[in-house]
Amino acid sequence: MKIERLLGATLCGLARIITGARAIHHAANGPDTTGGTTIYYANPRSHIDFLLVWAALPPSVRRRTRPVAGADYWLTSPLRRYVALRIFRAVLVERSGGAQAATDPLAAMQAALDAGESLILFPEGTRNVGDDLLPFKSGIFRLAQAHPGLRCVPVWVENLGRVMPKGSFIPVPLLCALHFGDALCLGDDEARDSFLKRSRDALIALAPTAA
């Protein structure tokens, strides 16, 4: 595990250097360093966006935080598999959905939360190549419903789509910022659509253009 931690720290450093990534905390109490079970949910723009969110967390929190990523991308080669499973300890899910999915994509996420680990999640369910945030899938609601008091922290990733344009394998140097907002919790008897809208609105509010 020591070599994986070293490689993880190295990748975090490289990501910061290439993108100039900086964390901006808009939460009233500043960044959370308690390491309590949390879902960090963000707007997906590239296959490395979870890396920047992960790298922006304090090391003590990062060690207990696992990104959720698509198995269809990260299991396509031995190197990607190693990076995803050994370095990031990613929770890999099938994104085909529907009745054709071999397993419940939420099962592994539930297990991680049950073990006291946090997650990095992208509620849109797919990489969004447009400017507007897509409607959220119900997964984040179901996870919050199954874990009362679970903290959901919105993270708006700015400029990453231009750092890793679609089809690109080499990052384009460009300043990138991660905007962390106040944590949300599912309210008592709060309906699914209400929570999804509230979570989505909280994420959109962090976008610089929304200021």
Where in this protein do the model-derived segments appear?
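Internal catalytic-core helix/loop-beta-alpha segment
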Residues: A90-D132
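Soluble or luminal CAZymes and related metallo-dependent hydrolases
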Residues: K2, L6, A101, F195
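Catalytic core of membrane glycerolipid acyltransferases/transacylases, capturing the structured
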Residues: T34-G97
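A charged, well-structured terminal subsegment
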Residues: L106-A107, A111, C176-A210
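Helix-to-loop junction immediately C-terminal to a conserved catalytic motif
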Residues: I3-S46
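Short beta-alpha junction loops
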Residues: G70-W74, G125, V157-G161
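A cross-family acyltransferase "interaction/gating" segment
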Residues: Y82, S118, V129-A191
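Residue-level preference for the first positions of well-ordered beta-strands
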Residues: T37-I39, G116-F122, R151-V153
